Amino acid sequence: MSFRDLRECIDSERGMEDVGLAAGRSQREKKRSYKDLLREEEEIAEQVRKSSKKRSRELDLFLASESHKKKKKHLTDDYHADTPSPDLAKKKKKALLPSPAPPSSSDTAMDLLKAITSPQVDTSTTHLPKKPEKILATPVNFSSPSQSSHKEHHKKIGEVSGDDSSHRSKKSKPLTLREPDGLRMKLILSPNEKSEEESASPQGGPGHSEGASSKKTSKKTGREETESRSSHKKHKKESHTPRSGGTPDSASSTGGELEAGELIIDDSFHEMKKKKKSKKSKKKKDKHKDEKHRKHSKSKREHEGEERPTQIASPVLPSPPPPTATTPTSPPSVPPQALITHAEEQLDKKKKKEDPEKPKKKNMSAYQVFSKEYRGSIIAEHPGIDFGELSKKLAEVWKQLPEKDKLAWKQKAQYLQHKQNKAEATTVKRKSSSSESAARSKGSSSGLPSPNKKSPTSVVSFSTSPAKVPDTEPIDVAAHLQLLGESLSLIGHRLQETEGMVAVSGSLSVLLDSILCALGPLVCLTSHVPQLNACPKQILSNTLDNIAYVMPGL
């Protein structure tokens, strides 16, 4: 026992060690996977940093190259400005007409401000009247006032643009600004783009040359964006930018806007046409729906009108009280014959409506019978013959026939017509007998006497009062036997017309029904013989009522 215990302990320890090893492996694998994820995230972050650094370097290089070009141009302009001519002085005066005071040689800062606010900011040639060497020697002093004034100007423009954007949505009037064309184009830009342009422009660097280059790039981008917007925004009134009388760029932009306006008118016209078409189609659909709904409602009304008489004819009348001496004197509250006649009138109307829809069957002529039988032989002689040629040949053969043959064909046609008429009559009788049996069943359930078939000897003494039970008098018995005789004679005629054998099951059922219908009324006669009067009157009257269900028929 001790050896087994030791072995079990060793096995359990080994199992625990295996479990511990498995847990350690899973933890190591988890740590490795987590480390791999961290490494991948670090690599992605490094790639993003590298790409952003590359972009910033490319932008710096682009700005530096542009600023270098602008510096060269500025130096050449300054060199030419050292030797002023009378023509140049006149041009300067014309350019500086919007400024309030004439330029002076001493106030360089004022001249710079006027040059910035003048309409010739687009051109890079800002001609300074005198002392170019001092300005070149001290670039820091020159850049500080210009940059500060430029920033203030930007702030003012931002405020004005914010107000104008809020007013543009309410009114579609064009703005009239006093600033030159470049600043006007800046007003159209969104505040986000302005902030991007301001961040892109270098702050406190090489001075006026870099500021001018950033201004030019921002102007170009602003013009391109406004042109693209004016072409894209067709359905907005804000796309019509204000025009300041000046540069050819503004004229071209206004021309583009006019073209866009024309396109807008065309598009709106097409949209109006489409809307009109859609409205017309909707109206047509609504009309069709209304017509369908009307037809459906009419058919429903007709159906309800047809169902109402049947519902009127079948209300359950009060159960008949026990037979007393005072029952014949009680007047009926609702005459049932009136209800039945109303139902019959409705059925007649329905039949009259259905009759014109059904095609009337024409009488069979001798020529029709002859052509029906002789057509097959002609087709066998001439296969693939046309209908017109076939009818011509049939007419020729009919003309050549002697009178005896024609008479034979006429007799045959008459016989066929008679047969057809008989078949139709039997089908009509069947329908009428089924309707009468249904009416009888309703009468028996409500305590009414069953309506009998028309016959010369059937003189029924049933009263119209619903409370009276059917009588078992000899006249009633005779009426029932007459009905049985009529039905059996009709069955006999039909059997004579049929060619071939008759089913045994059908004949047996007819015989059984006829025996029951004959014995029922005969049993009622026992009530008049005192020695045989053992059956109560109620049972006899019920048997006479139920004969309608057992009446034989094929």
Curated annotation (Swiss-Prot):
DNA bind region: 360-428
Pfam families to which the protein is assigned, alphabetical: DUF4171 (PF13775), HMG_box (PF00505)
Main location: nucleus
Function, as annotated: Negatively regulates Wnt/beta-catenin signaling during development.
GO process annotations (BP): negative regulation of Wnt signaling pathway; Wnt signaling pathway
PANTHER family named among the record's database cross-references: HMG DOMAIN-CONTAINING PROTEIN 4
InterPro entries, A to Z: DUF4171, HMG_box_dom, HMG_box_dom_sf, HMGXB4, HMGXB4_HMG-box
Biased composition (Polar residues): 117-127, 242-255
Keyword DNA damage: no
Subcellular location: Nucleus
Cystine pairs: none
Keyword DNA-binding applies: yes
Residue stretches of biased makeup (Basic residues): 272-300
Bias (Low complexity) ranges: 434-466
Record's protein name: HMG box-containing protein 4
SMART domains assigned to the protein according to its UniProt record, in alphabetical order: HMG (SM00398)
Source organism (scientific name): Xenopus tropicalis (Western clawed frog)
Self-association state and partner proteins as the record states: Interacts with nlk.2.
Sequence segments annotated as region (Disordered): 14-34, 47-368, 418-468
Comp. bias (Basic and acidic residues): 221-230, 342-358
Alphabetical UniProt keywords: Developmental protein, DNA-binding, Nucleus, Wnt signaling pathway
